[in-house]
C-alpha cells in the first residue's frame, strides 16, 4: 500500500567538495567551486591501478565523460590514443602529459600515481601554450615522500589478455565457393587454380591464420616502495618492473624503472625537493597502426586457408600454395597465380620484427619559498633529461610462393638526446571575505639537442 505520510527531501551543498583544490598547471590551484573550465579529476588511482590494464592511458578508460581511449592492434608498444572532446593541436593531436609539473616526464608505474587531472578544453589547457592546444592536458601527480614511520609496500598484478571480436576469414571450402560464384556471376570460366578437381590443394583448410598470429598473452606488474620521513625531511624510493606480452605472437614490452623523491624543509620559508627517475624499456614489435597490404593482420585475412605456416618439405615458411615437386608433377602446376601476392603473416611477425631499447634519466630539482606573505609562493624548478635510444630492423629474403622479396636489408640507428628546462613561477592565492583572488606569473626556458647515427645495409651475403 502507498503511504499517506508526506516526506520532505532537502538537498544541501557539499561544501567539502566545493572547497576541493584543483591543480591547473604550473602550480596554480583553484577551488572546485571557482572553476569555469572543464576539468576531470581522478583521485581513486589505487583502485584503478589494480585494473587488468597495461598502460596509464588504458587506466583512464570509462573514468571521465568526454575522454575516449582508442587502442590499435595487438602490439604492446602501441600507445593508446586519448581523445578529449575531439582533436586538434600542434602536438600531433595528442594530449600533453605533465608529470609533477614537467611536460613529457615518464610515469614509471601506475602504482606511483597519486591523482590525475584532465584539462578538457582549450581555455584550461591554454596555460601550456602551443604544446597542447585543443588536444587537452593530462596532469599527473605522483606519490611523494611522507612524514611518519618507515613503510615498505609491494603491489603485484598478474593477468592474461586475449584479442576479441577478430575477423573470421573464410575457410578453404568457402573461399572456393566464393570464387566460383564471383566468376559465375561475371560470366567467366573458373580458373584452374580454383577448380578443386584440377587443383585439390585449394579445397582443404590447413590453417586458421587469425589463430596463428594471435595468442593468449601474459602480463605482470610489480612495484615495491620504501617511505621514510620526519617533520623536516622525507624520502620515497620505488622500484617497478612490467612485462607485457603482446597478443600478437613474438611481441613484447618490458619496463624496469626506479623513482626517487626527496624533500627537505630548511626553515619555515624554504623547502627543496628532488625527483629522480631512471627507466629502461626494451621491446619487440610489429607496426599495426597503419597495417598496409603486407601487414600481419591484413595478411592473415588475405592468406589462403589452404596454405601452411611452414613448408613440410624443409621447415621453411610456407607460401600461398604447395611447393611439393610430386604435386606439381602430378597436377602440372601448383597454381600459385590463383592467390595473388599474399604474404605469410607468421613470417612477418617472427622474422621481420622491430627491436627497440630506450634508457631514460630524468632529474628535477625544485626550490619553494612560501609563507613570507599570506598566499604568496615562489617555485623554481630545473629539469634535466638524458635519453639513449637503439633501434634495429631486419628484413630477410622472402622467397616463398606469394609475394617474394629477393633483397634483404637491415637498418640500425642510435641516438643520444639531452634536454633541460627551467621554470620560475610566482603564484598568489588568497581569500578576502567572499572574494578569492588568484594570480600567476611564470617564465620558462628550455633546450633540446639530439645526435645520432643511422646505417642501412642491403643485399647482404649472409643472414
What is each PLM-predicted segment?
Residues 1-259, 264-275, 279, 288, ...:
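Short, small/polar-rich motifs associated with maturation and membrane association
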Residues 17, 33, 147-206, 246-251, ...:
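Surface-exposed loop/interface segments of Gram-negative outer-membrane beta-barrel transport/assembly proteins
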Amino acid at each position: 500500500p502507498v503511504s499517506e505520510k508526506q516526506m520532505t527531501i532537502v538537498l544541501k551543498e557539499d561544501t567539502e567538495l566545493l572547497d576541493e583544490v584543483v591543480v591547473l598547471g604550473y602550480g596554480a590551484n583553484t577551488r572546485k567551486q571557482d572553476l569555469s573550465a572543464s576539468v576531470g579529476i581522478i583521485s581513486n588511482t589505487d583502485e584503478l591501478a589494480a585494473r587488468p590494464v597495461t598502460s596509464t592511458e588504458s587506466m583512464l578508460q570509462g573514468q571521465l565523460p568526454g575522454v575516449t581511449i582508442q587502442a590499435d592492434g595487438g602490439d604492446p608498444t602501441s600507445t593508446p590514443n586519448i581523445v578529449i572532446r575531439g582533436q586538434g593541436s600542434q602536438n600531433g593531436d595528442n594530449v600533453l602529459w605533465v608529470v609533477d609539473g614537467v611536460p613529457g616526464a615518464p610515469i614509471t608505474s601506475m602504482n606511483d600515481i597519486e591523482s590525475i587531472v584532465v584539462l578538457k578544453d582549450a581555455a584550461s589547457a591554454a596555460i601550456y601554450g602551443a604544446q597542447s592546444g585543443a588536444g587537452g592536458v593530462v596532469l599527473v601527480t605522483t606519490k611523494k615522500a611522507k612524514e611518519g614511520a618507515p613503510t615498505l609496500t609491494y603491489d603485484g598484478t598478474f593477468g592474461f589478455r586475449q584479442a576479441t571480436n577478430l575477423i573470421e576469414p573464410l575457410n578453404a571450402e568457402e573461399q572456393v565457393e566464393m570464387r566460383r560464384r564471383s566468376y559465375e556471376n561475371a560470366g567467366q570460366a573458373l580458373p584452374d587454380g580454383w577448380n578443386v578437381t584440377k587443383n585439390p590443394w585449394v579445397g582443404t583448410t590447413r590453417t586458421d591464420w587469425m589463430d596463428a598470429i594471435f595468442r593468449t598473452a601474459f602480463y605482470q606488474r610489480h612495484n615495491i616502495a620504501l617511505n621514510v620521513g620526519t617533520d623536516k625531511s622525507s624520502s620515497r624510493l620505488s622500484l617497478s618492473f612490467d612485462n607485457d606480452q603482446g597478443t600478437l605472437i613474438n611481441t613484447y614490452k618490458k619496463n624496469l624503472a626506479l623513482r626517487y623523491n626527496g624533500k627537505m624543509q630548511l626553515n619555515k620559508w624554504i623547502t627543496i625537493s628532488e625527483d629522480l627517475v631512471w627507466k629502461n624499456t626494451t621491446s619487440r614489435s610489429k607496426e599495426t597502426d597503419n597495417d598496409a597490404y603486407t601487414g600481419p593482420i591484413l595478411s592473415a585475412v588475405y592468406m589462403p586457408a589452404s596454405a601452411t605456416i611452414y613448408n613440410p618439405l624443409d621447415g621453411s615458411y610456407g607460401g600461398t600454395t604447395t611447393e611439393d615437386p610430386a604435386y606439381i608433377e602430378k597436377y602440372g602446376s601448383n597454381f600459385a597465380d590463383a592467390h595473388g601476392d599474399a604474404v605469410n603473416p607468421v613470417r612477418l611477425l617472427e622474422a621481420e620484427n622491430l627491436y627497440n631499447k630506450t634508457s631514460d634519466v630524468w632529474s628535477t630539482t625544485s626550490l619553494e619559498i612560501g609563507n613570507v606573505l599570506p598566499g604568496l609562493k615562489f617555485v623554481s624548478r630545473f629539469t634535466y633529461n638524458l635519453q639513449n635510444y637503439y633501434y634495429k630492423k631486419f628484413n630477410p629474403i622472402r622467397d616463398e610462393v606469394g609475394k617474394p622479396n629477393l633483397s634483404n636489408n637491415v637498418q640500425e640507428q642510435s641516438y643520444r638526446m639531452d634536454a633541460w628546462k627551467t621554470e620560475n613561477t610566482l603564484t598568489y592565492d588568497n581569500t578576502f571575505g567572499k572574494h578569492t583572488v588568484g594570480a600567476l606569473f611564470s617564465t620558462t626556458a628550455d633546450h633540446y639537442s639530439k645526435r645520432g647515427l643511422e646505417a642501412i645495409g642491403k643485399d647482404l651475403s649472409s643472414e
